[in-house]
């Protein structure tokens, strides 16, 4: 075996060197003919075929077994043995002159045949460089197909000869193909090619070059072309003729005339140059091709050219002998590597990714992997909408926006989504739920929008998943409009009212509106529903031509991003390190006391450090859960001087009290920070410090109460809006200010140990100064650093030096004096002012300060007491100040930081004019466009000028700029003029103008002109003014009332009850002639305003108030219209009534469930502000002024 291995290695080297110079050819045994007999070949004794049933390993004695140089299922057999008993030594590999090509005419009855090399004696002929086509080699050699399979033109001189039935094992780039072409002289249209899975000569068949191992198959996919699958034998079909192909363990295709399958012309791509030899296909023996067995479910076929019509392909299970032939014919690793190297010389793989491809053509066969390729190609060609993608489960680096779409089947939501995703319109009514995704750019950042279209009602999973929900209905379908209201109710019931962060949008689709199906849902009804849904925007879209489609999704995504930022800001405010509210949030309110209700003093309610006691607070909160009597807290009045000095309470008492204070206040705004502080007003005459329970709420308000009991019961409390305030610390520079004198050696401006402060420069500056004890008999106070800096002429510099600067020796002539006390003492009760210029020196100022301290504290002992002052101020925009003092500077800094955070949050929630213009420009444009779209609003109501830009609110009409000046002269009781472009348009004003319009207004105010000519756009101002005054002031053209004799009050009640806006406007116009008797025979003595508020009709409510309805009118139970508006759940009606000075609801609202659940408007200010002007101008009776 070792000698055979040496011969193998040597033969390999020789073969590689002569690879480019030698052309190897295999010639099948020719039919018995005189011409064939003349061309003999040595080794004819080995030409007898072996018995097909004889095993491969059963070799005759004296014959050495052949060893293969290469094996790749179709490798060429090369003898590596020396001459034995039955064989001759193969000749050396030397080039031979090519003989002229000669056509071969096989016998009609003979069929083209290919068989593997038998294990007989070695070939005596060896590897001939150029065997003649008509030669008769020994039958012990395995003939190879030499028919050209590349489809290109054949080389010159090779058109007539060749080996019968030869074919290239490399028909295409990355694929394997067997092609049987008819001979050029007389092709036959139909032939039968039969392939078997094993060698005919034995049960352990050798490998064939027409089938490659699975691990080495490298098919490619390029464009519409596909390549052969792994382990599959493909037979390509040409353009003319066809053939039935039967394969075992592979898939074949019909074969016909030769087609162009490769761009490489005249070049050999096989080991033996057999692809350059044409061969006949008629009368040839059957082809026997060993193939790798593959499952029937994973059969693939490939072709580099579309196939013509062909009969169906028959798949057969692999023969048993094929598997044994594969297993017995495996080559070594070295042989396989060598074969890969040789194959790479003649074939050049494409750059496509490896993978099986589907079979093109009419056969339509594809494997599971081929189906995946087809699916992948279809998805790549489709738009960005992908259904059931893994994007719903995998994490991404870009943020997500989860958007849900709800609506009826006929709402048009599927067409809306399809238009947004693809940009094209398609009538879709999907009865099942779908999922989509698309990338969007929001605030300059890419977001992945996950769209979930729900076919039915939302469930709990959907309500928790969605960041925004779009409710879609069709403007021509009443049922879809009603379904939206039910869907919204179900969503709110699942998600809850209190859970914020959900952006809502209501969309009315115009896709189905036509002459046969007109619009049935008016704009006023849709906007009223949008108002009831709260924090909802209304849009009208048309997916047919894309009106507002992209805008809906863009604005909803923008709203989601804005809400997320606000939630993050609030979460940051709530997670302040100094607020212990989250540590004891689960403690019940009922169990709040401290050892029978006794507390020592103020110091017992404050932790000594904001970082201590969070873990212990949770344990102590459980300890006090069973105690009661919350009203007994702080009953005893304590001396102010002992609040911070005497700490008689234990740590457990302090923590339990602190935990109680943090858990109170259920049912109101979320408290961010709360504790006891000292408070005094800076503007009142009473300068005495009082202990208050101070609470900082998440809505931007600071509340303080005399006791915790008052806070629990919401009595005797004051609050201030932090939007209009700022917080300051006395003697401390503003944040971000950089000191010009270097870093401070003190802690928050207070030097703890003077012995460690460097009092000068140079070598002696590093020596600690001694600290002599204070002398009680002397009135000379210690020259502390605060007093020295405050005595400087520049007050700002003094403030900076007192807090942020390290004192140096040259700042003051007194700076080098040794301090008599180791502790620096700050003033506590009175702010020091800058000394006047008339004062002689700083010593006089110091003497005054000492005398004031002596008078205030009563003794010199208290002057040198180590007592610290931790004060901060809240200053309003009106100049009012509130002084608060904490127990430590850590607590003070925590309060200052929390208040600054809330001020920032309030300012960010409050929209300035520019921000409002940018964010609300599109929504305002929609409102203005809706006003312009009202009937008759394209021209001026008085002169007919086109495109009016001004409006009269109480008339409900649009006017031009020339007529607007005349309307202003009439007075606001007749005409309230507003610009469409320059003024803001609240929701209620937009509803009024869209509900009336110029057409309705002229039918009321200009019904009978009495032959008078109406002015035109070219009329003079005098003509316009005369017409306008006659029309609105003198009521000359007013439409008459009906023939009914009912009082105007009853007619107005009936019109309000019928919600007839035009009739209400006409009756209100006639009521100007005299007082309007609104008394009706109503058992509850309600007025039309009560009825309008009960019906939640915003337009009629606004018109009644403009035309003089009594906003303070009460019914039999003493309830005003505000009660009915809140009972109906109409926030807009309630806002309108409050703007016109409507008093409280009146009566008892506890018996009305809807009124009890309706949020109060005046009790707790809303944390969200629509505009800065509205926030600064609001009036609240609970705001503290002192």
Curated annotation (Swiss-Prot):
Region feature (Disordered): 24-371, 576-613, 628-666, 759-784, 800-844, 1145-1174
Subcellular location: Cytoplasm; Nucleus
Compositionally biased region (Basic and acidic residues): 47-62, 324-338, 648-661
Modes of activity regulation: GAP activity is stimulated by phosphatidylinositol 4,5-bisphosphate (PIP2) and, to a lesser extent, by phosphatidylinositol 3,4,5-trisphosphate (PIP3). Phosphatidic acid potentiates PIP2 stimulation.
Recorded GO CC terms: cytoplasm; cytosol; dendrite; endosome; external side of plasma membrane; Flemming body; glutamatergic synapse; membrane
Binding site for GTP: 407-414, 451-455, 509-512
Residues the record lists as Phosphoserine modifications: 113, 128, 149, 632, 744, 746, 802, 921, 979, 1172
Domain Arf-GAP: 925-1045
Residue ranges of every copy of the GLD domain listed in the record: 396-572
Keyword annotations of the record: ANK repeat, Cytoplasm, GTP-binding, GTPase activation, Metal-binding, Nucleotide-binding, Nucleus, Phosphoprotein, Repeat, Zinc, Zinc-finger
Stretches assigned to the PH domain: 670-904
Coiled-coil segments: none
Family in the record: Belongs to the centaurin gamma-like family.
Subunit architecture: Interacts with EPB41L1, PLCG1, NF2, HOMER1 and HOMER2.
PANTHER family named in the record: ARF-GAP WITH GTPASE, ANK REPEAT AND PH DOMAIN-CONTAINING PROTEIN 2, CENTAURIN-GAMMA-1A
Function per UniProt: GTPase-activating protein (GAP) for ARF1 and ARF5, which also shows strong GTPase activity. Participates in the prevention of neuronal apoptosis by enhancing PI3 kinase activity. Aids the coupling of metabotropic glutamate receptor 1 (GRM1) to cytoplasmic PI3 kinase by interacting with Homer scaffolding proteins, and also seems to mediate anti-apoptotic effects of NGF by activating nuclear PI3 kinase.
Protein name: Arf-GAP with GTPase, ANK repeat and PH domain-containing protein 2
Organism: Rattus norvegicus (Rat)
Lineage of the organism: Eukaryota, Metazoa, Chordata, Craniata, Vertebrata
